[in-house]
Amino acid sequence: MHFKRGSEGHSLPLPCMHRSMQDISQHLKQWPRFVLQAGFYWPTTFKDAHGFVSSCDACQRKGNFTKRNEMPQHFILEVEVFDVWGIYFMKKTIFSWKPIHPNGGRLCLKMGGSSCEPH
């Protein structure tokens, strides 16, 4: 692998970095981050990391990702709660409401046998 820092090219000891990583899920996360934190420019970072881990015998013997480490595969439903048309529609209907009670919309409580009468 050949990495660039500015205009000069360098080679990094990939087997040394590889031996320090134990988990396959850490390979794809730590290896590119290590190179980028060292100040190197690496245009095909994640493609090369995937190819390196795929060709490594120790990584392939480690096994697959567990369900815990997998990315969730369900859809996220995105709903716009306050739609502009809906708010406008609600304002028009709320202001056009009229009292439907015969007493003009006053609250009447029925206590025992008596009820309130409109004034």
Swiss-Prot record:
<dbReference type="GO" id="GO:0005739">
    <property type="term" value="C:mitochondrion"/>
</dbReference>
<keyword id="KW-0496">Mitochondrion</keyword>
<dbReference type="InterPro" id="IPR052160">
    <property type="entry name" value="Gypsy_RT_Integrase-like"/>
</dbReference>
<protein>
    <recommendedName>
        <fullName>Uncharacterized mitochondrial protein AtMg00750</fullName>
    </recommendedName>
</protein>
